[in-house]
Amino acid sequence: MAIDESKLNEFLGKAVGDLGAAMSAALMLVGDRLGLYKELAKGPITSSDLAQKTGTNERYVREWLGNQGAGGYVQFDATKNNWSLSPEQALCLADPNGPVDMPGAYNIVEATFHALDRTLDNFRTGKGMEWGEHHPCLFHGTERFFRAGYNANLITSWLPALDGVVEKLKAGAKVADVGCGHGASAVLMAKTYPNSKVTGYDYHADSIRTARERAAAAGVTNVQFEEADAVSYRGESFDLIAFFDCLHDMGDPVGVSRHARRALKDDGTVMIVEPFANDNVQDNLNPVGRVMYGASSQICVPVSLARNGPALGAQAGERRLREVVVTGGGFGRFRRATETPFNLVLEARP
C-alpha cells in the first residue's frame, strides 16, 4: 500500500500534539497541587519568584513553565522574562469555584493509570470494575470537575428548564439525588432552596461519608445522605428525582428507572443529566466525544459490566436513554430540556 507523505506528516503532527498533551497530564496535577496556577493567576511573575512563593525548586519550575507555555496554558513575556495566566486561563486553571475546573478533570485521568492493569484484563476478559475499586483520586476528580459544571448551570439554567420544578423547590419540595457521589449537586440544591428537603443516595460508603462532611462544612441542614443502591433506596412521594452523570453507569438502568417511577409523585419530575452525545457514532467523533469515549471505556462501561449491566456508556445518547426510561422504566413523557457542550439535560414525567 502506497504511503501518502502529506497525510503521513499530517497524522504525525497530530500524534506529536497528543503525545505532548499526554506528557503534560501529570504536570497539570503538579501545577494544581503545588499552587503554581493560583500564584500565576495573581499576575506576571518570574520562575524564581514563582518557586520562592510556592516553596518549590526553581529549576523544576522553569522546566514546568516551558511545558505549560508550549502547550498554550501560560503566557510568556520574553522582554520581561516573566510568566502569567490570561483571565481565561486563570478561570479554567486556578478558580476551583468557577464554571470550569480543568485540573479536577486530570484527577480522573490519573485514576485511569492507576487502573491500567485492570483495564487490560477487562479488555481481554469482558469483566468489569466496581466504582469503589478505583483509586480515590477518581472520586475527588469527579467531584471537582462536575461541581464546577453544576455551579455554572444547575441553578441558573438546568432546573429552570424543567416544567414547574423551580416553583416547587422554592415552596418546599422533596428531592432525591440518586448516585450523589460526594454530594456537590445535593448540597447546592439544598443551599439554594432552604424550604426543600434533599436526600442524596449512593452505594459507595466512602462517598456518602464525604458527602456528609461537605454538607456539614457548608452549614446546610436540609440535606441528608444515605448509603443505598439506586434500585432499592428508601423514600417515596418525591417531587424531584435527579440523576447527575450516573444513569449510564448503572448495572440495571431500567430497574433504576422503574424504582424512580414508583418513588415519584404522580406530578413529579425526573431530571437526568448525562454526558452530551448524539445518537450516531459518526456524530460523536469530535473532541468532546473523544474525552467521553475515553472515560467510558476505562470507567463507565466497566462499572456497569461489573454488575452484569447493559454498559450504556458515556455516549449513550438521547434515543437510547429514552428507551431505558420510557420503554423500560414506564415513564409517559420524556424530552430534552436543555443542553451544554458537555451535558444533555433530560426530563421525564409519569
Which sequence ranges carry the predicted segments?
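Conserved Class I S-adenosyl-L-methionine-dependent methyltransferase catalytic core
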Residues: 2, 6, 14-33, 38-39, ...
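Short glycine-centered segments of the SAM/dcSAM-binding site in methyltransferase folds
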Residues: 174, 268-269
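Conserved adenosyl
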Residues: 113-248, 253-255
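A short acidic, leucine-rich amphipathic alpha-helix
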Residues: 49-53
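Core SAM-dependent methyltransferase catalytic element
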Residues: 329-350
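A short glycine-rich, Lys/Arg-flanked "PGG" loop and its adjoining helix->strand segment in the class I
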Residues: 254-266
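C-terminal alpha-helical "lid/dimerization" subdomain adjacent to the S-adenosyl-L-methionine
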Residues: 273-326
